[in-house]
Amino acid sequence: MGLGKGKDEYKLAATSEDGGKKDKKAKAKKDMDDLKKEVDLDDHKLTLDELHRKYGTDLTRGLSSSRAKEILARDGPNALTPPPTTPEWVKFCKQLFGGFSMLLWIGAILCFLAYGIQAASEDEPANDNLYLGIVLSAVVIITGCFSYYQEAKSSKIMESFKNLVPRQALGIRDGEKKNINAEEVVLGDLVEVKGGDRIPADLRIISAHGCKVDNSSLTGESEPQTRSPDFSNENPLETRNISFFSTNCIEGTARGIVINTEDRTVMGRIATLASSLEGGKTPIAIEIEHFIHIITGVAVFLGVSFFILSLILGYNWLEAVIFLIGIIVANVPEGLLATVTVCLTLTAKRMAKKNCLVKNLEAVETLGSTSTICSDKTGTLTQNRMTVAHMWFDNQIHEADTTENQSGTSFDRSSATWANLSRIAGLCNRAVFLADQSNIPILKRDVAGDASEAALLKCIELCCGSVNEMREKYPKIAEIPFNSTNKYQLSIHKNTTPGETKHLLVMKGAPERILDRCNSIVLQGKVQALDDEMKDAFQNAYVELGGLGERVLGFCHYHLPDDEFPEGFAFDTDEVNFPTENLCFVGLMAMIDPPRAAVPDAVGKCRSAGIKVIMVTGDHPITAKAIAKGVGIISEGNETVEDIAARLNVPVSEVNPRDAKACVVHGSELKDMTSEELDDLLKHHTEIVFARTSPQQKLIIVEGCQRQGAIVAVTGDGVNDSPALKKADIGVAMGIAGSDVSKQAADMILLDDNFASIVTGVEEGRLIFDNLKKSIAYTLTSNIPEISPFLLFIIANIPLPLGTVTILCIDLGTDMVPAISLAYEKAESDIMKRQPRNPKTDKLVNERLISIAYGQIGMMQATAGFFTYFVILAENGFLPMDLIGVRVLWDDKYVNDLEDSYGQQWTYERRKIVEYSCHTAFFASIVIVQWADLIICKTRRNSIVQQGMTNRILIFGLFEETALAAFLSYCPGMDVALRMYPMKPLWWFCAFPYSLLIFLYDEARRYILRRNPGGWVEKETYY
């Protein structure tokens, strides 16, 4: 989609009715590909005459009002198109019917169906299935509301773009200046902007006076950019004669012609790109889907098997259908949906305390799966404040303190040359501290002025005391501000220092320009002639500091002779009447936006965690490379192609790119790369820096990483980052410096803008994945002792050992707090020392977990329950062998003389009291064996002795489930409400040996696992 080609080319071809969905899909893909292309704009290359012909605009009088109206009618208002939004009710329904909820809904529907069948075929149907259906529905609705509340976020991306649109613009129509509503600005309009204005559309500058714009939201460059009518670069994003919609004019004035409006502006394209990107499923959503498939598979397999078996055993088909439904429902872990949601919420809260605000619960785990981080440079890896890093004076480079708390090195300040240099930096400087900040640390104070001048001001204030007092001592008489032609700034001050002349001229600017204006230099406080040796020394220092990616400024002064410039002399800065040549060079000062203190350590942690960190920035390659080396993205000893060429003293073209582990890629190189070349680059280089990238390229880089199978996290703060943030598996925006747009596009916000907080997030994400596995293993284990009574009831025709209501008391009662308590479990080992999990092989729930939970521990638990059941019935006279086949008579309410093993007769009422006592005891047995299960689930590899019992919530969970079980058993009225009967104290102890057996069995399994890593036991049982 080329820009600046006139409206009609953008009219979308109407798709014919029968073209159908294929055409629409193909068209959407084509539009998307067009948006991803670089800005195609040639207006910056046109002369003023050509512009006049193209847009029909009079370059002094502007458009006529009637012509402007025509264009407005043709093109529509200068406003961004809002994206299609998802209604809130649809979002709510997604929470209610998405993923795991669907399984529970199916369970609920089957329960109602079973109850319906029973109600139709029996006189007095049992209400168990009805209760179960109601409870399942309630669980889904409550959890859905909770999740919706947690994620009540709408895709407000475009709304925040609306905040970028300036309300009013100063246009020139019919030769008159008029305030026009920004939405009415049209193609070809002549517009004026001044300092403080927001640019109303993409403009081609035709005249400017000291105009600087802040393009940081668009390109990521923190330095203000000069704007003038000069065509300075082939790239429209870097040329001086174009200013972009919604960027800010900081100072000066400019006049320009509107070359693009609304969605066709560069910012509009980014907006459209961000809002039309589809985010994929989160890794945890994929895991839960996989888990549902496993559980459903097991449930349907068991259900169908026993359905067929019950028909073979002679049950009628209605009974068989009820059994089928019962088995499928019994397999559904009712409490797991709530457990997973609560676990993720707890982690989200824990992350918020560590400055990571999670907008989307599932993103909590995504960060833990991350294998590649594409990080922005400015403000994320760096402090987002220009700081003086080095000075060169007395023919020596001195290092300044760039740390955030001024705990670094300090340089020798005793030299008279430093006194001269600091005086120039303080006086030839228009930056000032804002009022009432005397009690705020110098580095944290707000400054009015540009970033470089603010850096100099803070440096001098730190090193030499109050700059204000210095300026009062040397009052300013005249000044020539910095401009792009001269490349210097100059001011003249009254000088009250004894032994010096009455006027002092100070100048700063581009080092080579300043040196050209000097014929002497200050060394150790003494003036010497500027010879070739000193010029070479200057050149070496300049190259060295420039090579560190620093912005270097030169400083010089001149004591104006009193005989020519007496007190009261009228200095004229237009017709310059004072010397600007043959001055005295004093030194250099170099500034950089320094890395944050915690970042190198964080990057190191990422590396040991197997996470690749890629820097993607709009800044210059040299600066980007310097910061990348400073923070360890390019590690010590790793060379780029350019480094190898320099070391071997050969041309870059002769070096094999595969020999270089690191590489710095310029946006212009990336522009010419095919997808295959980009894939090759990402595959074969471990350390990569992309510099001078455009927003579209950021998106292409993210897609490239995803093609490699990486789970990608992207950090960003500008509007330019929003497409990449949206496309990434997890977008991380900056809370302080971030634009509204980037925060809306992201899944997570760093409240302190610090890259190190991401590493904390990765750690929490990995931990919650491990702990969710433990939680699920714990919850699923009790499924077997819950299902097996039902299966034996069908096959062996014994009285039902465990009722539906009792199962609910386990799943939604006693098991809930212990399962959630596992979310608080600490890591077993250093989780940041292992590789990121492979989403294809390392699943949340795998066959081994099912085998342990169902096949091993679950079976032991079921045995414990049946042991208790048979003990109680035997105590009451029914020996195990006599129970087989007794079910039909047992459940017949008209049989009141059923004989036990000793010939005693039992009425229906008395039999049922014994049966319900068995249900209660079976329930208590499950609680007791779940003690051991909870303790063994604390760890997947370590011994419990190593892991310790420091998780207080888990200990509380053990007491809570026991207390709840006792309450349900002994509370008066429970026999009526839940059919729970008081138990003899001895019955509690039936399951104790099994609980101990489970504990010892799993300790032995983990001991073998630790002794033989990679052995048979690990392959078969390590989940």
Swiss-Prot record:
Residues 109-131, 309-320, 793-802, 867-918, 971-985 are extracellular. It is a multi-pass membrane protein. The chain crosses the membrane at residues 88-108, 132-152, 289-308, 321-338, 773-792, 803-823, 844-866, 919-938, 952-970, 986-1006. It is found in: Cell membrane, Sarcolemma. CDD domains: P-type_ATPase_Na-K_like (cd02608). This is the catalytic component of the active enzyme, which catalyzes the hydrolysis of ATP coupled with the exchange of sodium and potassium ions across the plasma membrane. This action creates the electrochemical gradient of sodium and potassium ions, providing the energy for active transport of various nutrients. This is Sodium/potassium-transporting ATPase subunit alpha-1. The lineage of its organism: Eukaryota, Metazoa, Chordata, Craniata, Vertebrata.
